[in-house]
Amino acid sequence: MAENVKRKKKKRAVLIVLMALVLAVLAVVCVYETELNKLDSNDGVDNSFYDSQFKNKKVMVIVPHEDDDLLISGQVLPPMYKNGADVRVVFATNGDKRVSAYTRQSEACNALEKLGIPREKVIFLGYPDGTQLYVGKKAFSFSSGWDHTYAGKGFKDYHFDRFGTHAKYTAENMVDDIESVVLEYRPDYILAKDFDTHTDHRGVSISFEKAMERILKKESGYTPKVLKCFGYSLAWKSKPDFYALNIKSTVMQDREKNNDPSYETDVPQYRWNNRVRLPIDKKSLSHSILRCSEYKALSEHLSQYAYCYSERIINGDSVYWNRRTDSLTYNADISVSSGDAS
């Protein structure tokens, strides 16, 4: 009898301790959430900037892979779109080297929807991932085996949607399709990746430059503002500094990691002091990374484990360099007085 009483007392004591622990944990969580809400409650970035710069403007993002859009524009696209910009996101490849095109394209659309960008604003050019297409080698999709543009089930590649046929995998066709999609929508602003440390990033960057050269020669009155940036050195492979004080700004990559350490960036003519900084709406940020809208979008790219790089990608600004499109040399006929002009 006495032993039963002792057991009941022990059980009661254990239950009381457990309940006390649960209540303590709940109290800590409540206090944390309350303080976090206080820290995160702000008016955000002055929307007059996005309203004055992007309202009723056309903005196009051109990137190699599904998830690269988040690296270079994931934090600025939402305020652009919310303040009246007509946004288009163009993916050059299907990202299908190890994962199906359907998976990558679905992830991209789901991620952008997390940021408020609807699926109809997304364009897939449908070129292969991880090939030597850009240097004239014959290219095939690693996952599908096809040698022409395509899209996953439920999606359409741009060339087929526009012209009724698929485009063969050639460097020239990619340039043609980039030129076509730019001229079709005629964006006022173009955000694109520059000469990054990735084969596809470099190839698409060069293809974009070739397409823009053609466009500027053909359309002398069309001079969109082109902003280019690095998705690897300033995002995917940058410092994991979300919880550091420099969340206020993207930090410059260590020079020894550059293609040539004697320059500040991977493109020699880009000086760090000449970068263009677009502010981030603080409402999309939080002192808890799990609350950040960019983190939620990155979490949709499960095949790439993109959320694991959130501490590197999420920043207090987005950094670009202005690629001038108003140079008279684009319309000039070049000649030489002697020697070989080739």
Indicate where each model-derived feature is located.
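Active-site beta-strand->loop->alpha-helix modules in alpha/beta enzyme cores, enriched
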Residues: 13-20, 26-206, 210-221
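The feature marks non-catalytic terminal segments
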Residues: 18-33, 45-50, 107, 111-115, ...
